[in-house]
Amino acid sequence: MAKAFVFSLCLLLVFNGCLAARQSQLSPQNQCQLNQLQAREPDNRIQAEAGQIETWNFNQGDFQCAGVAASRITIQRNGLHLPSYSNAPQLIYIVQGRGVLGAVFSGCPETFEESQQSSQQGRQQEQEQERQQQQQGEQGRQQGQQEQQQERQGRQQGRQQQEEGRQQEQQQGQQGRPQQQQQFRQLDRHQKTRRIREGDVVAIPAGVAYWSYNDGDQELVAVNLFHVSSDHNQLDQNPRKFYLAGNPENEFNQQGQSQPRQQGEQGRPGQHQQPFGRPRQQEQQGNGNNVFSGFNTQLLAQALNVNEETARNLQGQNDNRNQIIQVRGNLDFVQPPRGRQEREHEERQQEQLQQERQQQGEQLMANGLEETFCSLRLKENIGNPERADIFSPRAGRISTLNSHNLPILRFLRLSAERGFFYRNGIYSPHWNVNAHSVVYVIRGNARVQVVNENGDAILDQEVQQGQLFIVPQNHGVIQQAGNQGFEYFAFKTEENAFINTLAGRTSFLRALPDEVLANAYQISREQARQLKYNRQETIALSSSQQRRAVV
């Protein structure tokens, strides 16, 4: 009897332990019991040498529900955002500016190579200088010969000097040839770089390192979404950035104790007392904070076949710079020249490719040969008004991006949407069928309402430029642009996210029979017909004020 009791007790403990573990795994889903949402600006800021990184507190309930984290990166002119990778897939939207982005795929070849012509330009300049020196030497020798006519001894000395000079020139020429050959062998090669500009959406898989550089004439601003609940993230749901250079600070507070940006501007104790860089304690220790920093210096030097001084530079020892550094001079690397005609040609190619995909449909997507791993297309521009998928001359326009027009999103299971609404324009009330929506306000303002399953408005707020808010899956939402118009970008946590509308020509109400509407809402059949057919627009709706203004 006692043995049976002990066995039952052990079995109960094991069962409870398994149940607790299962509940901990499902905790992100249980975080979606939300009573209130809020649109807000970033909670934390890290000041860097050539820019800043701002992050939203991912421990807030709405971020935990959506399984995402977000940051905003500002890179000043001639600033370099150092290479890093993340434990979660990223979707990046370029809000402002232009620059260059490079993504490193392990095992792929370096397809960008410095031409021999560019490397020979430097040698030609050196040879030109040598010729000028030889001409000057020849003139000096001629003058010496005129003087040597008066004295035989002087002529003999002159001949000896000329002979020695020729021998030195021959020796220098022989030494120069292997140096030129060595320079030819050491031409710069690297993986593909991509031009980025306002309106671009860039997809970065988990674990893929990337860097970015601002070579434009204004600040480069980007908003990053980290899909931490993705299947590609095998760690916990804390966003992690692994930097491969510099002495970076932690962008996301793992303890969830977010510091207001106002405090960051005034300086947090031991962290922001300097204009940029690591805390003073770590600076005194001379330890870096990138991936190389944790390795033994001697072992790292042996692995890379370099001296220990170079290894210490990789580790960021005694380096006070963090994530974004200022480039001295210009950043010179191999990239194809781009003129106006090339940009127009690239845009036409993208439009043609998109039309072909729409015509061929899923057959092109399923053959598995459209793109190789090393040539994945990572970006698509959805800022061009001509690219709009939905347009109303009195309300605004909406552009969507999914796995059909950017195939890598099928792998990341993300999609995006960009909208621009005129003054008082309305985004039809709707719900997201299969995704959460993370909305960033690019410009303007709007009134936004979000309703939960109990009919409660858990968000009723006027959102402003620079704020971000989350609309959970299946929650009803309506947006109306303010006096300044409303321009936004929305990250969607599904590769082909779609919505169901509550108003308009393709709405839920339009699909119901008249009698169902009349009985469901206690209205007459005539009123039901008006409810169904009064609105002929689809998603971008003009307000009554706009219609009166047109009349």
UniProtKB/Swiss-Prot annotation:
Tissue: Expressed in seed (at protein level). Expressed in seed.
Signal sequence range: 1-20
Entries under PROSITE patterns matching the protein: 11S_SEED_STORAGE
Listed Basic and acidic residues bias regions: 339-350
Disulfide pattern: 32-65, 108-374
Biased composition annotated in UniProt, kind: Low complexity: 114-124, 132-148, 168-185, 254-275, 351-360
Entry binding sites for Ca(2+): 194
Pfam families hit by this protein: Cupin_1 (PF00190)
One Gene Ontology biological process: cotyledon development
Listed GO MF terms: metal ion binding; nutrient reservoir activity
Entry keywords, A to Z: Allergen, Disulfide bond, Metal-binding, Seed storage protein, Signal, Storage protein
Thermal characteristics: Thermostable up to 77 degrees Celsius. Complete thermal denaturation at 90 degrees Celsius. Thermal stability decreases in the presence of a reducing agent, dithiothreitol (DTT). The acidic and basic chains have lower thermal stabilities than the native multimeric protein.
Coiled-coil spans in chain: none
Position of sequence motif NGXEET: 367-372
SUPFAM superfamilies, per the entry: RmlC-like cupins (SSF51182)
Region Disordered, annotated ranges: 111-194, 238-293, 329-360
Boundaries of every Cupin type-1 domain copy: 37-312, 380-529
Taxonomy, superkingdom: Eukaryota
Its job: Seed storage protein.
Family affiliation: Belongs to the 11S seed storage protein (globulins) family.
Subunit structure comment from the entry: Hexamer of two trimers; each subunit is composed of an acidic and a basic chain derived from a single precursor and linked by a disulfide bond.
Protein name from the UniProt record: Prunin 1 Pru du 6
Organism annotation: Prunus dulcis (Almond)
Lineage of the species this protein comes from: Eukaryota, Viridiplantae, Streptophyta, Embryophyta, Tracheophyta
